[in-house]
Amino acid sequence: MAKEEKRVVAQNRKARHDYFIEQTIEAGIVLSGTEVKSIRAGKVSLKDSYANVKNGEVFIYGMHISPYEQGNIFNKDPLRDRKLLLHRAEINKLIGYIQQKGMTLVPLEVYFKNGKVKIELGIAKGKKLYDKREDIAKRDALREIDRRLKENFR
């Protein structure tokens, strides 16, 4: 059996800064052919995108896929809502999570796995300003420790 490859195309770095990621889940996505070609070319942005459950189905909103240059009439709207592919049990679990106060679904990354486009969704809770400052302070402290250790081993 072939090894599963995971080639990350786009990441939502802002999501990890703005939210506490409680859990992640992998979902497929319904796309047209020209959208897949644009994603292969890396022309996708997850900035300001989010996912939500509507009528028992999960959709992603605000995900920008640039039109494919050679696609002409087959290109779709770059910001259209796109359906995510999940099992019913997974959707029910997501509904339970996002009905809790302060919880939301945030796309973390888009990647290819065995030739199929996948999205990693994070079940997230928003950070307050002081939480963000705390994370930045921790990161700076770790960076300083690494710098000092590197100097000592020279």
From Swiss-Prot:
Transmembrane segments: none annotated. It holds the Pfam family SmpB. One of its GO terms (cellular component) is cytosol. It is found in: Cytoplasm. InterPro entries: SmpB, SsrA-bd_prot, SsrA-bd_prot_CS. Gene3D superfamilies: 2.40.280.10. GO terms for biological process: trans-translation. The keyword Cytoplasm applies. Keywords: Cytoplasm, RNA-binding. Disulfide bonds: none annotated. GO terms for molecular function: RNA binding. Required for rescue of stalled ribosomes mediated by trans-translation. Binds to transfer-messenger RNA (tmRNA), required for stable association of tmRNA with ribosomes. tmRNA and SmpB together mimic tRNA shape, replacing the anticodon stem-loop with SmpB. tmRNA is encoded by the ssrA gene; the 2 termini fold to resemble tRNA(Ala) and it encodes a 'tag peptide', a short internal open reading frame. During trans-translation Ala-aminoacylated tmRNA acts like a tRNA, entering the A-site of stalled ribosomes, displacing the stalled mRNA. Belongs to the SmpB family. This is SsrA-binding protein. It comes from Acetivibrio thermocellus (strain ATCC 27405 / DSM 1237 / JCM 9322 / NBRC 103400 / NCIMB 10682 / NRRL B-4536 / VPI 7372). The lineage of its organism: Bacteria, Bacillati, Bacillota, Clostridia, Eubacteriales.
